[in-house]
Amino acid sequence: MPAWSLLVLSALPVVGMFAGQTTFFSSPWETLFGTAAEQHEAAMDGRIQGRGLLSSHFGWYGWPGQTFDYVIVGGGTAGLAMAHRLSEDGSNSVAVIEAGGFYEIEAGNATEVPMFLFNYFFDNGHVKNPLFDWYQYTEAQPGLAGRKMFYMQGKTLGGSTARGAMLYHRGSKGAYQLWADRVGDDSYTWDNWLPFFKKSVQFSGPLTNPRPANATASNDVSAFAATAEEEGPVQVAYPYLTNAISSWVDKALEKMGFPEAQGFSNGQLLGRSYITHTIHPKTRRRDTASTSYLQTALRTSNSLNVITHTLVKKIDFDEEKRATGVVVNTGGFEWQIGAKKEVILSAGVMRSPQLLMVSGLGPRETLEKLDIPVLSDLPGVGQNMQDTIILGPTNPVKVESHSQLMGSKETLPRSIYEYNNFRTGLLTNPGQDYFAFEKHQPGNLSEATAADIDKAFPADWPTFSYIALDDTFVPQYDGKNYFSMSAALLATFSRGTVTINTTNTADNPVVDPRWLDDPRDKEMAVAAFRRCREIVASETMQQVIDGPELLPGFEYQTDEEILNYIAETSDAYYAGVGTCAMGKPDDPLAVLDSKARVRGVKGLRVVDASAFPFAIDGQPMATVYALAEKVAADIIAGN
């Protein structure tokens, strides 16, 4: 985890709730909380102006007989996009049920200031906020030295868009062709996805000032909407600040033969480029499904109802196996919400399969062990979990990096002042603004593993992504400048599971990603680590490297030594997918059809990352937004 994140809480204020009012207390620092307070106040004003009363959009908890056309479980990435589109024309009543609340209030600046994301991103032993995260831990991972890994999962309006790294890019064209082939539906090819990608976001190009001339960001603007009528509410932009180390990595990769990519959103990933984020280009704050889709809906729709701090316990069905609503719990009070048309699960890769299983849809053996009546025997529920890890060496550098925020008495206060007063400085950048994607190279993998990758994945699918992480994996407290040339594995073979050992959805499910379980993944991890070292050792990078490798140190040379270091220090990618996978009718592990409908029942869909048939080649956020747009369009069209 980035080391500086343990310190930044000293810059955060304390929040108190008294008599229904939010009270803000300034810290000794130049407080940043005004950013959160101002945004929340503006959002409230907008809703009051648009709808007359704030409460007109929020649930009458426990009101008998509450029924809506569509009930959406989970107010996260997909759930809020679906809610906005289904309620947009006012003809459908829509309820969103969210276990959390507003992250701006419950977590403050750590969720809004781009560089503060790492406060709650990892389990650092010091910072815990169960108000907006499920605090899920995995089973012990043999491939990661037996560690039980913290797995970030947003429990808040906005979901993991309020928690994650804000990275926005799309998969390769080959990935979406594979999706279409896997589910038997050509509407999932790249050309058919593209309108929904465009419909979900607003793109802003890089600023020419203060961006340095040697930090040019290229982008294929045809991948984004050409007019305001075609675009959506999510802000996609480049961070205001460019990390100093990134221009050196760019120059090094160019000399190593990496072609220049066009921003990673046009279906072509192989190459190098600065990467876009979901950061508002004017306020320079995190933009989420809540600040985009939800706020738009609250301003414009009369038919959306948002029910917060409410946990869904199970799905109700009638005698014809049609979903008729959900049983929920709000503060210990259990009640029911009805659905006239459909229930849509958007609870995420862990909680969507959990809800299916406690409601009687899943592997028969699992359900019978817990005395759950089997409504539909679906052996694929909770199977096929796919995620990856991030790894790499750390080196001292001669340019300013975000690692200075830890241990320097000047850098953090200065950065807070710059952000608070001018929206400039280190805090405008999340610390990872430069990426590259590469296929495996001849000789860096065994012939057998290379052949397996070539057979399993499309020709334009990268094996590795490389990230210029402007910080350290392991905390350093000396205030010096470090950077980690990092890599993620994108063509993995390990598969994990999500299951349950209780019928209570207040209990976390049992999550076992099985990272590096497959020996081919271990081989790729070592190859990626060596490639990172090769980049750092290049003539260009050596001009800015300021001494010997800090971590793990050059005494780690053999494959076994490197693999042990990776097992002990690598972090989760937090991009799990596939636990309620789409598939063809003859696929025994398919949970959904290509319209995201759950097999064996009626009136129930799953629309979130769990619906992916496989992990795409990179970050899933852009594809989750587009999937929600796509399925919502299908529903509205009556398909």
Swiss-Prot record:
Q: Which Gene3D superfamilies match?
A: FAD/NAD(P)-binding domain, Glucose Oxidase, domain 3
GO terms classed as biological process: secondary metabolite biosynthetic process; sterigmatocystin biosynthetic process
How it assembles, according to the record, is: Homodimer.
Pathway field of the UniProt record reads: Mycotoxin biosynthesis; sterigmatocystin biosynthesis
Q: Where is this protein found? A: Cytoplasm, Cytosol
Q: Which UniProt keywords apply?
A: Cytoplasm, FAD, Flavoprotein, Glycoprotein, Lyase, Signal
Every copy of the PAS domain together lies at 263-301
Which catalytic reaction applies to this protein?
A: (2S-3S)-versiconal hemiacetal = versicolorin B + H2O; (S)-5'-oxoaverantin + H(+) = (1'S,5'S)-averufin + H2O
Look up the signal peptide feature and give its range: 1-19
Q: What is this protein called?
A: Versicolorin B synthase stcN
Q: Where does FAD bind?
A: T77, A78, E98, A99, G164, A165, M166, L167, A609, P620, M621
Family annotation (InterPro entries):
FAD/NAD-bd_sf, GMC_OxRdtase, GMC_OxRdtase_N, GMC_OxRtase_C, PAS
| Similarity section | Belongs to the GMC oxidoreductase family.
Glycosylation sites per record: N109, N214, N444, N501
Instruction: Write out the GO cellular component annotations.
Output: cytosol
